[in-house]
Amino acid sequence: MAGSTAGYGQIIEYIQDKLYLASYDHTPDAKTPFPYPAEQPKSPSKRRAQASPSKKRSPVYFTVDDTLLYNSFHADFGPLHIGHLYRFAVHFHDLLAANNDRAIVFYSRTDARSRANAACLVACYMVLIQSWPPHLALAPIAQADPPYMPFRDAGYSQADFILNIQDVVYGVWKAKEQGVCGLRDFSLEEYEKFERVDMGDFNWISPHFLAFASPQHQPVAPIPRDSPEYAALPSTVSEVRSSRLPLPFKNVLEHFATRGVGLVVRLNSELYSPSYFTALGISHIDMIFEDGTCPPLPLVKKFIRMAHEMINVKHKAIAVHCKAGLGRTGCLIGAYLIYRYGFTANEVIAFMRFMRPGMVVGPQQHWLHLNQGSFREWWFEDCMKEKLAQMQPNPVTPGRSPAKHRAAAVTTPPQNGHSKRSALGEIDNNEATPIYDDNLPAPTPGQPRKSHRKDSRHHPYSRTASGSLVVDKDTRKTRRSTDSSESEEETQLRMLAKQRSSKSPAASPGQRSISYSATVTASYTLNDDIHEDRENWGGAAQPPKTPVTSKTSGAVSVSKVRSSSRRVTGESKGVRKPSGRIGSTGSPVRVKAQA
């Protein structure tokens, strides 16, 4: 519910008589108009029953525009992170306790960025702390006028991918429902300390993933394990604290050793020696790809497999970093969160920025959006493999198989053993063998074209692979002996006369009667002369009549078809469909004729 006062903008009610959201271009005071609660019309009553009107107390106003500041990278302005939400909640609860009988108005300045951050902060508070469902948290601000400004990435290029408040709210809600985010074990002091560049620049994205910027320390080459230099590396937390390493690197090593980090994944070029991590018993692996680019899918799948094993088998956390711990780091962590918990791309980007501002930059946003389906597909495949493995009984040693089974045993094909699909190959073989997408040409623009060949990949109901005609013996014999000037209709009439002349009153005991049907595929071509198909016009007055069969043992149904000079050729055109309907050009039409 939203109220408004002239010249003061819109005031949105979140909790009746408790919390309101507003924006002012000046600091509000007791004289600022406040439309809640709305005055109810009074019913007529006796004078002695009228009570003296109670004085309505003015609400309490507070803002965080000058206290909770977003540290932007370039043109980004939000959303505010989880530390801001924690401080907002503490301050709001203090105001509620001190003003039990007064409404509280959380307001911001009237500029678009301040309004968006304030509304997003309140909606996330309702979801994460008050446990509201997302639709209820979004309902009060859904029809805000003017609408709230969407958020953008931290890159230096023009923003071409946006996130709105709904994405942030649903991302936070999904993380809470999956146990990925919560304030029960959240330490504000630790969060605000280690997010600073001079203190390590790292944040926990989830209980199993930590994102951090690359430490920088010389030398950068790995130190051999059997060398004296490796033995001198700090191997305990106390040795790390007493070492002469830079403070950010020291904080990283100490925090990782005490918080159960089991794997460090480096995505950028070498700026430190990995031996400092391995000396503490922390595995280290390089999965380097170019800054600002998107990782190849095989690398992503390898990362997901390693991370899943580290989390579920070794019960350790994973720390991922690139140069700044934002773009490339967000790609891999976001891919795993989509894979495991079913985030959408917008939700996971918004949630990661809620935990560590600036994550996922530029085209990496589109990359996550385009590949989110593949990540979920990998999860379903892995779950199905696990279920099938559990359902499979204990393996039994097989006995000696017969010779015919051994001869038909399936062997592993050689590398690239399948035949390449040529541009002009055998029709039947191309359809009988599986199609390898890697060998197909790239899709070309334009509309698909109809083809005379029935492709079993697109027409699964075709009866023969090559679309060949199947006709009876009499028809083939007649076609071979037919003169080039004889039309198809004359051939059918001559066959009918032959069958009538050969009828007998009783079946011969030495002969057997065979009834069979022939499937004929006929292709019709529409001529340019529209007057030759007058019976197929939509405005035809009379529908085609059902042909009457003769009362003989060898009856054949034949429809009356007008002869055309253009159809009198030596080439066989198949059997004309009795219904008078003509299939479109290039689309075979099957006609079932009773012989």
From Swiss-Prot:
Organism classification: Eukaryota, Fungi, Dikarya, Ascomycota, Pezizomycotina
Cell location: Nucleus; Cytoplasm; Cell septum
The keyword Cytoplasm is assigned to this record: yes
Ranges annotated as biased composition (Basic and acidic residues): 471-483
Compositional bias of kind Polar residues: 502-526
Name of the protein: Tyrosine-protein phosphatase cdcA
Annotated keywords: Cell cycle, Cell division, Cytoplasm, Hydrolase, Meiosis, Mitosis, Nucleus, Phosphoprotein, Protein phosphatase
Main location: nucleus
Sequence ranges of Basic residues compositional bias: 44-57, 449-461
Name of the gene encoding the protein in the UniProt record: cdcA
Active-site positions on this chain: 322
Spans through the membrane: none
Main EC class the enzyme belongs to: hydrolase
Region (Disordered): 32-57, 392-595
Organism: Emericella nidulans (strain FGSC A4 / ATCC 38163 / CBS 112.46 / NRRL 194 / M139) (Aspergillus nidulans)
Leader sequence residues: none
PANTHER family listed in its UniProt record: TYROSINE SPECIFIC PROTEIN PHOSPHATASE AND DUAL SPECIFICITY PROTEIN PHOSPHATASE
Purpose of the protein: Protein phosphatase which antagonizes mitotic cyclin-dependent kinase nimX, the inactivation of which is essential for exit from mitosis. To access its substrates, is released from nucleolar sequestration during mitosis. Plays an essential in coordinating the nuclear division cycle with cytokinesis through the cytokinesis checkpoint. Involved in chromosome segregation, where it is required for meiosis I spindle dissambly as well as for establishing two consecutive chromosome segregation phases.
GO biological process, one term: meiotic spindle disassembly
Superkingdom, natural source: Eukaryota
GO molecular function: protein serine/threonine phosphatase activity; protein tyrosine phosphatase activity
EC code(s) of this entry: 3.1.3.48
PROSITE patterns (UniProt xref): TYR_PHOSPHATASE_1, TYR_PHOSPHATASE_2, TYR_PHOSPHATASE_DUAL
Tyrosine-protein phosphatase domain ranges (all copies): 233-381
Family: Belongs to the protein-tyrosine phosphatase family. Non-receptor class CDC14 subfamily.
